[in-house]
Amino acid sequence: MICVLANNLVLIISGSSIMKRNFKFSKIFYHYHYRPFTIYSFVYKSNFAKVPSEPGSLRNLLQRHRPYSVNREVGEVKLGEVATSVGSTLSKNLPQGSLGLQKQSGKEMNIVLTEQESEVCNILRKVTAYLKETKQLPLVELRIAGGWVRDKLLQFECHDLDVAINSLTGSDFANYIKEFLDKEGDNNNKVKIHVIESNPEKSKHLETATTNLCGLDIDFVNLRKEVYEDSRIPVSLEYGTPEDDAYRRDITINALFYNIHTGQVEDFTKKGISDLREGLIRTPLPSCKTFKDDPLRVLRCIRFASRFHFKIVDDVKDVIVKDESIKVALNKKISRERVGIEIDKMIKGPDPVQAIDLIVNLGLYDVVFSPPPQENIVSGNLRAPKFCLIVAKILSWLLSNESKDYNVHTIFHQLNENEKRALYLAAYALPYKDMTYTEKGISQPVYQYVIRESIKFSNDDVNKIKKLLSSIDFVIKTVSQNNEVLTDRRGLGLCIRELNSDWPTTLLFALSNELIPKFEYMDQVKENKEIKEINNKYTKFIERIYELKLEKVYSEKHLLNQMVLDLNC
């Protein structure tokens, strides 16, 4: 059984076949391995599509029909005769995530705790009871907040807990935990507390105490109520109610609470649960206020949209696009390290393509990937940011199982996560490929500045991206020459030595760039001969490498390798 959610329609595919046509929908939820995927508007070009036997292949079947332009609000899907070999394999994973939420009303929502989580909650309840009995303090109430609640409702694992306290600072409460455990003689939980000070200038408004309890990382922070006086920085931070705190958070699905004392999920914005159910990214307050409080939340909206394949609501998009002050604040107020952390999470997430799609189409490309000062730029022009989106989409297709059917070499499907990360990072930096700037009198590629300074990635990342971007023309030329006349052993060996151990990723990135002119035909790849011919060139080149046993020639000592090449040329 496969449940496909289309607005309020649940389509169940089972039995021998089902005939449904022209369904209008805004999103489809497909669940596999505890991850929800939302596939926005697409059109089946063919009259029918067979559902493959492997759930992972089903995901690819759906994803391949996503449009290569900006995702539209509503699309049309035509389902013809659908094979049913999936059977009960997939149904064992349902309901998950948002589909699971469809079966629960807000009042009935419960969270099932793991053994570790139960132990943590028991300790925290004991600490509050201890404080009530021994300290002259207001009643202490504890709630787990934010991402843990969201992930538990989506049935994901989460090992980081944020505990919100109504009447104490995080550090005060953490010290009381230590006091209580020492008094109880609990040798299994030796609490070490680290306090992260607030930094309002960088939008870090609250002091946070971090510790590890029962093997789980826990942050303690007080519920907040911020008071502003015509400034982006709060003039005072007061203890707030859970409702005050919920409305100060980034998005509604992160503003849910789990009350440790009652065991209930609390939705004070009245939208968190419904947005989680409907797959929407929305700010609790008007988005201009939420973003001015912390402009990094713009990127967090994008990250969570791409992580869960959710839709950012239109009023939030409009503010991001039209309010230039938000972009200025994101560029000037937020540390580049924080920006880089968000970008890294997007690249490592389930859909780096949707992430860069949103960055580009919300007009944030040169804000996030900001270039050096204009006076330092000496040559070249910024290519349209759409090119990085095009290459990212081509990479996604080349890396997918679907491309195996179109003579894309299998070596590209064996790349590890770090290699894929480098490929997408190179795609993100592509618009700066032909630009140079001067630093200390030395001319350098602008993309090096962007990676090293704008998003604060490592020098290793800079070197990897330099290799991928600088080798595009060389690889395309070498592969084309081999297609006309087979490259001899010496020439091919020197090529692999030049590309080093990264030669598979370098070839794949060059291939993705060579396919750019054919991009508009990518949804018709099966019928397009030119795309097949380009793929064939690279497959032929790789097969030549393996035929001559040169796939690891880069690791051989240079002198010995040169002699071998000379003897066999």
Q: How should each PLM-predicted stretch be described?
A:
Residues I2-C569:
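Catalytic cores of the polymerase beta-like nucleotidyltransferase superfamily
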